[in-house]
């Protein structure tokens, strides 16, 4: 029972085997006391890391102590708790079954969820994107063949609206894994770098980030190695970007030292897994003998495309596996499969390293053939087809009103600082893009991540004062590597085709890496960088380094690294190699369309502003907004108020705008009012009697206005009937123009009368008057 875990919620000991085991009742209280004593004796430990003007506090041993590893990372008043748990029995999966979930709680910001159930439902885009960043930072450091279900949960405990929690979560995951007995070759440290007024700022606050031209997250490993990069930038220069990476790596080393100090104080001992799922050297050696020459022939046959190459490799795989099963009948099925994978990867990589050639015949720095086409469909606001090798992407642009942008509720704004967004890019990867069958409903994490990267690439060139919400869709029709960067290229072309005045064209490219490692030192002794990688080069390589930008600078970057760290030198070379390729792609794109169209498509949407005087606003809006709703329903336009007298009208087509304009002109038409003279006396017709006064018209097509009781007579009255007034009766009134505050017409009957000179008693009935003598019907009419 020493290997069991105690669960206080159900008073059970859970053995590490799957079956539950219930303690005898007499032993339960004793077991609970023993666990509590262990907690109190262990205590909690904490370290603080100084990062320039910021301080990072890392603690463990106080919260979530049943987990294999747990930690709380805090900066200012923002705190994130991270737990790590890994099973001790292997998973049937033939890959590393790691799940990372980052969750934001409304309570962390002192708010209540705004949905119907008033609780956290589903996962937001921000949570998914943060989970992906954490996953990419820690996954490369698990040992090869560690196929044990592992879960890392990041729980936002508190957010102060100043310090961003995502970088804290990366560091928290590193601490939780380092302090656990889970096999993991960490730690890693992560920081955010911003450039504000030319200064490099470490972990800038949310307010500082609003004025930063760079948002770079760097995850580093010991010895100044880089594990993960994620960045968006305002088209900054390459040298500034490279320097920011170096600054980030420097500060990650300080965090790593703090974590190592905490691990040393805790005295962590890593568990020994039952087995690591790596094939035996004997089977690999025999596989090498069977398949090496045939694989070499396939990988050096430059006539193959993706489909034929995959078919040829699969044929060799089936033949080899059959022979391996005969030779090693007792071998695990996984060893048979993985042995072939090891040999195939070895042959593929040796060709790149030794012969400087790639499986499609290109040299290391060559691009695939690129072709572009715009204005694919006339009815679309903008469209483009981007083809790079066997990767094909169709991008479209759609305009809508500013009201159609993404709206953030109060909770999201409080936690993330994200406000309304009027530019978005949505990426779709249907199964037919790789000749597969699969579900097409819902949005998976990969699609969201790729779309977010392409959106970052294009956002800096979008004009901030554009009068429409812009939605770019990117549908991958064929995929053989780097579809996210193809989406950035296609999106740029579609934006120019639609007439969006972007400041510059944007292109993106992916750089791959193949390394040779010294088996004794574990360090990279040789490597090759590959420009514009294929899918097979991504699979067999060590890095997928995506970078996008303009001719001038960089707008987005994402580095997925499969090694437990690469030197800064390789990253700098990758950026330089990508910049050369990016400019070459832009030259090809400019041959198709070199600048945005001077005007939008004829069938595109239209936006206009309409001036509605305060005096006409009530009629324009109508009772309960009736006129506005009717206008929007009949014409399809969207109307939003800009200020007191200005309304913005969005129409999906010019014809809809024409209809709306006629409707507005007709409903607000009032020709006679311009002829009314200030201070003149006019004859008004009573159309309605109310408790507060009478509704009158000065001319037939006028909207009735209220003549208040206080302006009916010199004497104070409680109801118009006290004066004998009736519907249809004509009375004399004086015109005093419009009220500048609310635009209402100002009329008075009282000023045409002589002041009252007598005072009488107050009556309580509706016909009573307060001041002066009772007025007969005849006297009223005479007035």
From Swiss-Prot:
This is Polyribonucleotide nucleotidyltransferase 1, mitochondrial. It catalyses: RNA(n+1) + phosphate = RNA(n) + a ribonucleoside 5'-diphosphate. Changing residue 475 to G: In DFNB70; results in a hypofunctional protein leading to disturbed enzyme trimerization and impaired mitochondrial RNA import. The gene is PNPT1. Changing residue 387 to R: In COXPD13; the mutation alters multimerization of the protein. Its EC number is 2.7.7.8. One of its GO terms (molecular function) is poly(G) binding. Keywords: Acetylation, Cytoplasm, Deafness, Disease variant, Exonuclease, Hydrolase, Membrane, Mitochondrion, mRNA processing, Neurodegeneration, Non-syndromic deafness, Nuclease, Nucleotidyltransferase, Phosphoprotein, Primary mitochondrial disease, RNA-binding, Spinocerebellar ataxia, Transferase, Transit peptide, Transport.
């Amino acid at each position: 029972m020493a290997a069991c875990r105690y669960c206080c919620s159900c008073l059970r000991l859970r053995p590490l085997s799957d079956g539950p085991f219930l303690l005898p009742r007499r032993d339960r209280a004793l077991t609970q006391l023993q666990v509590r004593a262990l907690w109190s004796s262990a205590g909690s430990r904490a370290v603080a890391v100084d990062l320039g003007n910021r301080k990072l506090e890392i603690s463990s041993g106080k919260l979530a102590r049943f987990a294999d590893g747990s930690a709380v990372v805090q900066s200012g008043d923002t705190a994130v708790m991270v737990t790590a748990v890994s099973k001790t029995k292997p998973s049937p999966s033939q890959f590393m079954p790691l799940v990372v979930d980052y969750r934001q709680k409304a309570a962390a910001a002192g708010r209540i969820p705004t949905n119907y159930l008033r609780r956290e439902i589903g996962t937001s885009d921000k949570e998914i994107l943060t989970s992906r960043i954490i996953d990419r930072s820690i996954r490369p450091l698990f040992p090869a063949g560690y196929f044990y279900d592992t879960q890392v949960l990041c729980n936002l405990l508190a957010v102060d609206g100043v310090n961003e929690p995502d970088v804290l979560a990366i560091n928290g995951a590193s601490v939780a894994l380092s302090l656990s007995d889970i096999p993991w070759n960490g730690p890693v440290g992560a920081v955010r770098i911003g450039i504000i007024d030319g200064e490099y700022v470490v972990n800038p606050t949310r307010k500082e980030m609003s004025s930063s031209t760079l948002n770079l997250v760097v995850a580093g490993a010991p010895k100044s190695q880089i594990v993960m990069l994620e960045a968006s930038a305002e088209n900054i220069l390459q040298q500034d970007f490279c320097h920011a990476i170096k600054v980030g790596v420097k500060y990650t080393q300080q965090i790593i030292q703090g974590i190592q100090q905490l691990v040393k104080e805790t005295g962590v001992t890593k568990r020994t897994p039952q087995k690591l799922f790596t094939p035996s050297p004997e089977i690999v050696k025999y596989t090498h003998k069977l398949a090496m020459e045939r694989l070499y022939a396939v990988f050096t046959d430059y006539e193959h495309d993706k489909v034929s190459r995959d078919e040829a490799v699969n044929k060799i795989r089936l033949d080899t596996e059959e022979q391996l099963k005969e030779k090693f009948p007792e071998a695990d099925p996984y060893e048979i499969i993985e042995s072939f994978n090891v040999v195939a990867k070895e042959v593929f990589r040796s060709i790149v390293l030794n012969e400087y050639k790639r499986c499609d015949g290109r040299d290391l720095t060559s691009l695939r053939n690129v072709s572009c086409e715009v204005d694919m469909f006339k009815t679309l606001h903008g469209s483009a087809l981007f083809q790079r090798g066997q990767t094909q992407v169709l991008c479209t642009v759609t305009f809508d009103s500013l009201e159609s942008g993404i709206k953030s509720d109060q909770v999201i704004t409080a936690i993330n600082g994200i406000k309304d967004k009027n530019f978005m890019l949505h990426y779709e990867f249907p199964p037919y893009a790789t000749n597969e069958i699969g579900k097409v409903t819902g949005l998976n994490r990969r699609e969201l991540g790729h779309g977010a990267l392409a959106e970052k690439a294009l956002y800096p060139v979008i004009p901030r004062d554009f009068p429409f919400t812009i939605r770019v869709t990117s549908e991958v029709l064929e995929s053989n590597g780097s579809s996210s960067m193809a989406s950035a290229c296609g999106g740029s072309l579609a934006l120019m085709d639609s007439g969006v005045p972007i400041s510059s064209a944007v292109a993106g490219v992916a750089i791959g890496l193949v390394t040779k490692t010294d088996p004794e030192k574990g360090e990279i002794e040789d490597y090759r960088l590959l420009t514009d990688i294929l899918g097979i080069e991504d699979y067999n390589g060590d890095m997928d380094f995506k970078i996008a930008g303009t001719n001038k600078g960089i707008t987005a970057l994402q580095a997925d690294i499969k090694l437990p760290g690469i030197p800064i030198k390789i990253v700098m070379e990758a950026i330089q190699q990508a910049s050369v390729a990016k400019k070459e792609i832009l030259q090809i794109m400019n041959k198709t369309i070199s600048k945005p169209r001077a005007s939008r498509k004829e069938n595109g949407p239209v936006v206009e502003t309409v001036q509605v005087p305060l005096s006409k606003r009530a009629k324009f809006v109508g009772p309960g907004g009736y006129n506005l709703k009717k206008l929007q329903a009949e014409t399809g336009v969207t109307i939003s108020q800009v200020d007191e007298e200005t309304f913005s009208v969005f129409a999906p087509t010019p014809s809809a705008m024409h209809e709306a304009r006629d409707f507005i002109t007709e409903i607000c038409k009032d020709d006679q009012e311009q002829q009314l003279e200030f201070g003149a006396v006019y004859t008004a017709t009573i159309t309605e009697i109310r408790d507060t006064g009478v509704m009158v018209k000065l001319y037939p097509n006028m909207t009735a206005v209220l003549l208040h009781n206080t302006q009916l007579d010199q004497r104070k009255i409680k109801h118009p009937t006290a004066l004998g007034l009736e519907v249809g009766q004509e009375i004399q009134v004086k015109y005093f123009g419009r009220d500048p505050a609310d635009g209402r017409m100002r009329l008075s009957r009282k000023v045409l009368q002589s002041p009252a000179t007598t005072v009488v008693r107050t009556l309580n009935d509706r016909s009573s008057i307060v001041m002066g003598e009772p007025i007969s019907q005849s006297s009223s009419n005479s007035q």
